[in-house]
Amino acid sequence: VLSPDDKKHVKAAWGKVGEHAGEYGAEALERMFLSFPTTKTYFPHFNLSHGSDQVKGHGKKVADALTLAVGHVDDMPHALSKLSDLHAHKLRVDPVNFKLLSHCLLVTLAAHLPAEFTPAVHASLDKFLASVSTVLTSKYR
């Protein structure tokens, strides 16, 4: 459960991401594909090379979903319901992949926002991404 301080940290950090959200989303995906090559199996039709339009496009989708989650942090299950359905029933993404992408997002944010990425912000973002992952996997049961 996110505390009031966690929510404050997440909103402030995501506010700093701002217009770079899509770029950071794509970078996190590239990190995931390089660090965890088995994740590529969910994107057989993508050009996964550095800077590809498909990776950039999906990175923007990831960032947009996180922006939605930040904006509805008190009601993420409702806000992310359609996305949860998509990943559980159509795409059938193994839930472990959300943890891998979350890790890569944290690394990306730490690299781009070193001054803002304090231990408290890191912990809050980690809890937030874990909450998003829980919501996205809630319909797998």
Swiss-Prot record:
Entry-annotated residues carrying N6-acetyllysine: 16
Segments crossing the lipid bilayer: none
Modified residues annotated as N6-succinyllysine in this record: 7, 11, 16, 40
Chain positions found as Phosphoserine: 3, 35, 49, 102, 124, 131, 138
Positions of post-translational Phosphotyrosine modification: 24
Residues found modified as Phosphothreonine: 108, 134, 137
SUPFAM superfamilies reported in the protein's UniProt record: Globin-like
Residues involved in heme b binding: 87
Pfam family, one: Globin
Any one Gene Ontology molecular-function term assigned to this protein's record: oxygen carrier activity
Keyword annotations of the record: Acetylation, Heme, Iron, Metal-binding, Oxygen transport, Phosphoprotein, Transport
Residues that bind O2: 58
Reported tissue expression: Red blood cells.
Keyword Methyltransferase set for record: no
Quaternary data: Heterotetramer of two alpha chains and two beta chains.
Family as reported in the entry's similarity comment: Belongs to the globin family.
Name by which UniProt lists this protein: Hemoglobin subunit alpha
Gene that specifies this protein: HBA
